[in-house]
Amino acid sequence: MILMVLEIKNGIYWVGVIDWEIRDFHGYGTPYGSTYNSYLIKDKKNVLIDTAKDYMFNELIYGISKFIDPKDLDYIIVNHVEKDHSGCVDKLVEISNATIITNEKGKEHLSLYYDTKDWDFIIVDTGDEINIGDRTLKFIRTPMLHWPDNMLTYCKEEKILFSNDAFGQHIASSERFDYEIGEGIFEHAKDYFANILMPYKMLIPDAIKAVKNLDIELICPSHGVIWKEYINEIIEKYNEWAMNKTKNKAVIVYDTMYNSTKKMAHAIAEGLMEKGVEVKIYRVCETSLSRIMTEILDAKYVLVGSPTVNRNLYPEVGKFLAYMDCIRPLDKIGVAFGSYGWMECATEKIKEIFKNLGFKIVDDECLTVRFAPKEEHLKKCYEFGKRLADIGF
């Protein structure tokens, strides 16, 4: 077995697992794969921070064994109980009898996944510290980023923040640091934020305040690469994304049966572009939902088009709307459009989702058409796009 391990600072090691093949992460498209980052600290007490999925146990053990006997683990820090991070905890406890360090919610959630009645726990809260020898570990609770049990671990002496899901990216690569990839890493971080953290972004400013008070040389997330060169930049981007800062951008999402809705989408897009709006158009059946949500994160306008099928939405549009309702982007201008035969229902269903999300809905008589749009109707769609570009909150 040839697997990668890396010393990231003196006595601190990346011993995670690279998942080259994964393309779907509980509904979130991962075209570039992912990693499950686990970190080993060798000190008077040997500490493992987070683990990996249960079926990756052998790879994780291999990495740990390069530096210590896994039986010699003293502490396992569980920053987050989701099983891509805690999946190997039960087997590691069985091998090592290590004490679990987590918060009260973390203990509760672990007990719902595993038989923990014989496990030893140290329960921590924000501000608590544990000395492991030459180093001290400090803990910061970040509930609902993105589970109630989430927390951060900070190594004061080494100036390392072990951030778990915060600042993560789904990317499988041989590179372990941000500067090895370059500024392209921000797009991966944006994609992760949009699809994992967007529903809870109102909580992020408080977490950012806590992080900014720390002296940080490395941010070590549990997915993707380690932040070293771009620490200030990624913190600032998180702040921007959390504060709903938008660009003059429209995302148009549609599906079509006989190209009627497609023609409307493109006509509206032409009008928007005429007024200088950046436009992204996606036929939803040909694009991953996570890719679309990444573009919606900083868009001002969200336009959704669907033909009516048996008094309902076109199936892939319905799937997209359910996903968007789950991710919950805020402060958008919403437009529903589409074609129908004898009963128009799709646009009303789209607007119901918009209302649920608090979008400002813009309507116009040109946004629905029976059967197929003629040139005069497409001209109205084009003019509507131009008018839409002048609408704000």
Curated annotation (Swiss-Prot):
Residues 250-389 form the Flavodoxin-like domain. SUPFAM superfamilies: Flavoproteins, Metallo-hydrolase/oxidoreductase. PROSITE patterns: FLAVODOXIN_LIKE. Gene3D superfamilies: 3.40.50.360, Ribonuclease Z/Hydroxyacylglutathione hydrolase-like (3.60.15.10). InterPro entries: Flavodoxin/NO_synth, Flavoprotein-like_sf, Metallo-B-lactamas, ODP_dom, RibonucZ/Hydroxyglut_hydro, Rubredoxin-O_OxRdtase. One of its GO terms (molecular function) is electron transfer activity. PANTHER family: ANAEROBIC NITRIC OXIDE REDUCTASE FLAVORUBREDOXIN. This is Uncharacterized protein MJ0732. It comes from Methanocaldococcus jannaschii (strain ATCC 43067 / DSM 2661 / JAL-1 / JCM 10045 / NBRC 100440) (Methanococcus jannaschii).
